[in-house]
Amino acid sequence: MCVATCLCTFAYVLAKSDEGENLISKVEETQRGCIEIGGDCDGYLDKSYCQCCRNNGFCSCYKVPEWFGYKVGCKCSVDWNFVGWCRLKQFCPGGSQNPSLCKDPNPRRRRHGK
């Protein structure tokens, strides 16, 4: 009786761990993909790859005075009043999950002479 119960429990635990690994890979994909507005993004740690934000938001960095110094961080935002942005400001058109679709919202425009 115990052998059958133990085997069932062991199989259940294995099934759960497989599902857990899938969840971890999905979380990693989400972190490397587009981030919801209001979510934390990486603007200071890796300026060469500013993470993409959904709905044409930008990874905006802020610096807020506190009692003992400043609170700094970066969040996906649509507001322009944050202090500075990532060097490579990027957004994902249409809320895409694919970071390769992210592009600079301020491309250099050619000036046409008259």
Curated annotation (Swiss-Prot):
InterPro entries: Omega-agatoxin_II/III_CS (IPR005853), Toxin_34 (IPR013605)
Organism: Agelena orientalis
Region Disordered, annotated ranges: 95-114
Function: Inhibits voltage-gated calcium channels (Cav).
Superkingdom to which the source organism belongs: Eukaryota
Disulfide bonds: 34-53, 41-59, 50-86, 52-76, 61-74
Signal peptide: 1-15
Residues that make up the propeptide removed upon maturation: 16-32
Secreted listed as a keyword: yes
Lineage, top ranks: Eukaryota, Metazoa, Ecdysozoa, Arthropoda, Chelicerata
Protein name: U10-agatoxin-Ao1a
Annotated tissue distribution: Expressed by the venom gland.
GO annotation, cellular component aspect: extracellular region; host cell presynaptic membrane
Domain notes: The presence of a 'disulfide through disulfide knot' structurally defines this protein as a knottin.
Matches recorded under Pfam families: Toxin_34
